[in-house]
Amino acid sequence: MSAFVDAVTVEVKAGRGGNGKVAFRREAHVEFGGPAGGNGGRGGHIYFIGDEGKNTLIDLKYNRHIKAANGVHGGPKGMHGAHAEDTYVRVPLGTIVYDDKENLIGEVLEHGQTLLIAQGGKGGRGNMAFASNNNKAPDFAEQGDLGQIFLAKVELQVLADVGLLGYPNVGKSTLITRISNAKAKIADYQFTTLSPQLGMVNVEDDAFVVADLPGLIEFAHLGVGLGLQFLKHVERCRVLLHIVSMDSLDPLDDYNKINNELVLYDEKLKDRTQIVVANKMDVEGAQEKFEAFKKALKDVKVIPISALMNDGIQTLKYEIATTLKTIPKFAPKDTTKHYTLNAEDAVDFIINKGDDGVFELTGDKLFVLFNRTDFNNESAVKRFARQLRGLGIEDALREHGVVHGDIVRIFSYEFEYLE
């Protein structure tokens, strides 16, 4: 069995758009051929796709750099470059993705569902696209936009209908093997289950997924034991099967402490539906403890079983199936499409004076224009200068005290300011 990995950070790098082409028609008997450079193709996107056959993020742990291909450059004779193929990465159901600013990109909940993680850059326009009445033969083109590059935080919350809840060594692993097709490791010591075990349970025409989660202990909400690793997986379970061992010194105290940990982790979990199970009814003195436990819980239904002896298992399975029919599945989390730049967050340009006396220009809009410019093409550089004036950069530089002969740096490009 592969190791269980439920959190990983990966670098995603979508493809850059292909460059536009500078070309002209040069054919016999065509006196004024005009521009004929095609546009570049779009860079490849990066998608995650849900795969019900996966239950861990271990593939991402050993592949922390995910890249998509670049778009094809435009060609002569008006030929546009092909879009790059998109990159698809298979992930388990329950995968949640955040960008490097902690914005939620989305989550993968269904088999075959695709989630856009990083968007490929637009292809640059060829010189054919810039022809106008004022410039019938443009001799410049755009370079393709960069694809998105960032560190993505990927988490897995086990996607199960039912989560087994309880102290270590209450018999959860034995129970899941009795009610489902799961093959859990079983031993008589704490924390036998170090990672979630999933099993499919069939009850007549119904079927549901149950998860045996790592045992919970007191102060788990503070990260003690496997606390936080466990608790985040509880969030996605529609029903919690709260198992209390009747060979405990104080079953009621165990029950109350586990519920307290849930509430301290997330107040909303106090309203999560629970089915309370009294396990190990085969041990000596269990019946007396069960009666006292049931009396203390008053109106809460308690189902007595012995997972070891296979007693009460069918009754429990029917109870779970009946309860699940009354509880809807979770709606997806609200997402923030990180690749959509909010108007209030976009900055055309920022001017700072560096320690070396050089005036530095940065900004969102400026970055896009800069990357689209071919600085080996004089006409493209002149167009970039016109775009800077259009943004008001020339006036802003003078307001910041820039004078004739000063050096101005725009990202990796330096030029001398001339009045």
UniProtKB/Swiss-Prot annotation:
Residue ranges of every copy of the OCT domain listed in the record: 341-419
Cystines in this chain: none
InterPro entries: G_OBG, GTP-bd, GTP-bd_Obg/CgtA, GTP-bd_prot_GTP1/OBG_C_sf, GTP1_OBG_dom, GTP1_OBG_dom_sf, OBG_GTPase, OCT_dom
Entry GO MF terms: GTP binding; GTPase activity; magnesium ion binding
SUPFAM superfamilies, alphabetized: Obg GTP-binding protein C-terminal domain, Obg GTP-binding protein N-terminal domain, P-loop containing nucleoside triphosphate hydrolases
Native source species: Acholeplasma laidlawii (strain PG-8A)
Function: An essential GTPase which binds GTP, GDP and possibly (p)ppGpp with moderate affinity, with high nucleotide exchange rates and a fairly low GTP hydrolysis rate. Plays a role in control of the cell cycle, stress response, ribosome biogenesis and in those bacteria that undergo differentiation, in morphogenesis control.
Protein name: GTPase Obg
GO CC, alphabetical: cytoplasm
Enzyme class name: hydrolase
Cofactor(s) it depends on: Mg(2+)
Keyword match Manganese: no
PANTHER family to which the protein is assigned, alphabetical: DEVELOPMENTALLY REGULATED GTP-BINDING PROTEIN-RELATED, MITOCHONDRIAL RIBOSOME-ASSOCIATED GTPASE 2
Biological process according to GO: ribosome biogenesis
Residues given in the record as GTP binding sites: 166-173, 191-195, 212-215, 279-282, 306-308
Residues involved in Mg(2+) binding: S173, T193
Stretches assigned to the Obg domain: 2-159
Subunit structure: Monomer.
Record EC number: 3.6.5.-
Lineage top rank: taxon: Bacteria
Assigned keywords, A-Z: Cytoplasm, GTP-binding, Hydrolase, Magnesium, Metal-binding, Nucleotide-binding
Family to which the UniProt record says this protein belongs: Belongs to the TRAFAC class OBG-HflX-like GTPase superfamily. OBG GTPase family.
Domain OBG-type G as annotated: residue spans: 160-325
Localization per record: Cytoplasm
CDD domains noted in UniProt: Obg
